[in-house]
Design a protein with these regions (language model features):
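Interdomain hinge/linker at the junction between the two RecA-like core domains of SF2 helicases
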Residues: 1-36
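C-terminal helicase lobe
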Residues: 26-30, 34-104, 108-167
Length: 167
């Protein structure tokens, strides 16, 4: 593997705090909803989520209904025309956030993505580097790679490794 140096990508890694009246899932939802509200400004964000089957349901949970028009999902089982339309809408700024599996990766070249947020850890370090590399391809942009981390997040990594693939 070669050396990759991207000085225009910073990191925003926060420890997920579980409040007294919450469990892990409620705390994660609370934090993601807050992050989603923050991210739906004039910037472009990719939010990586590891499981394709529930992305569309998660959008309804994480994004206020008044902002649904600004968000799309992207995963392997969408057909080629849908994927192309989503990429074009994101590129043009009609969509400000894509909630995606790692299928939103290779071949996607959008230079003005500001933020990449990981709901859970990527399945491998190489995947993580590739995913955060979507941010700030335009060297004049300061990109942010963000996550809210909890030790329970490793559960997702273990599931991904045991499944052998992400769609």
């Amino acid at each position: 593997m070669g050396i990759v140096k991207r000085e225009n990508i910073g990191f925003d890694i926060r420890l997920l705090t579980i409040e007294e009246d919450e469990n892990y899932d409620k705390a994660k939802q609370r934090v993601i909803i807050g992050r989603t509200d923050d991210f739906l400004d004039e910037h472009k964000t990719i939010m990586y989520y590891p499981f394709a089957g529930s992305i569309d349901t998660r959008i309804k949970m994480w994004v206020r209904s008044t902002n649904w028009r600004l968000v799309s999902s992207y995963y392997g089982k969408k057909d080629k025309a849908q994927k192309a339309a989503i990429v074009e809408a994101f590129k043009e700024g009609d969509k400000r956030m894509i909630i995606a599996t790692k299928a939103f990766g290779m071949g996607i070249d959008i230079s003005d993505i500001d933020r990449v947020y990981h709901v859970a850890p990527s399945s491998t370090f190489v995947d993580y580097i590739q995913e955060i590399g979507r941010a700030a391809r335009d060297k004049s942009i300061k990109g942010i790679a963000a996550t809210d981390f909890h030790e329970r997040d490793f559960y997702f990594m273990k599931r991904l490794h045991s499944a052998g693939a992400i769609t």
